Amino acid sequence: MPTLTPPAGSEVIPFASVHTERVEDCLVFPSELSTKVRLGGLVTAVSGGILGAALLSQTSSQGVAVPALLMGLSFVGGLLSTWSPCGYSSLCLLRPVGPYSARSLVKYTPTFLLHGIGYAVGALILGCVLGIAGGLLGFGGVSFGALAGLGAAGIIYGAHQLGFLRVPYPQRRAQVPHDARQRFPVWFIGGLYGLSLGLNYLTYVQTPILYLVTAAAVLSSNIGAAILLFAAFNAGRFLPMAVNYLPVSDITVQNWLARRQEGAALLDGVLLVAGGAALLTFAAL
């Protein structure tokens, strides 16, 4: 047993070792996808985007097909943003307090609802600002130039996500304020985090689909359309919080996300390329 060295003439004091709980190092990491897999995703996305747009053009007008495509892309982009640092943080920090029970879930519900309201307010603010900005800049909604520009951006950023290109992706590299938990009740934190994340540009968002949604909102020059686009994106960001109503531990959720980080990036790239190819096809038709 180790001892503490005493001053001269003093009694030797035994020092018993103390076992402390610790978090084990992560031993399982997502493997990097091969070039063959990423290239296959790129080719499949281009083919699927072109074919999908051609089929849609036979059954519906561009005025219906293009908004539907952008809304779907926005929603899935919101889901994929769960793999951003703040997505991990929110799922971890905004959990029911205490053992899993009906009582803890009831007490958690105001936090969950206020988190969703925060996202809704964020979509409302962003949609109004970007829709008005588009009108002031003179954009006129769906046009050849708008479709071609959005399509090219989708393919370029999709190739970026797939690792074939490196293009600028400026983001504010910040997270929600973790210390707020020490100063405010958890229901207030739920609303605060929802608003911070719902504004999308206050914190880091991993998916470039956010850029496509922003550009589409501005180009629409329509406040209602811009709000709907960000409502879809923010709904995708918010819905994963519902996992906290299930009897699963925080570490289980975090590990599930971590093991699928590369897969999420692959899906992100494939969707961007497919969406871009579809928009370019609509522009050409």
From Swiss-Prot:
Transmembrane annotation, as ranges: 39-59, 63-83, 120-140, 144-164, 184-204, 209-229, 265-285
Pathway: One-carbon metabolism; methylamine degradation
Cellular compartments annotated: Cell membrane
Protein name per the record: Methylamine utilization protein MauF
Gene giving rise to this polypeptide: mauF
GO cellular component: a single term: plasma membrane
Keyword annotations of the record: Cell membrane, Membrane, Transmembrane, Transmembrane helix
Organism: Methylorubrum extorquens (strain ATCC 14718 / DSM 1338 / JCM 2805 / NCIMB 9133 / AM1) (Methylobacterium extorquens)
Major place of residence: membrane
Topology with respect to the bilayer: Multi-pass membrane protein
Superkingdom of this protein's organism: Bacteria
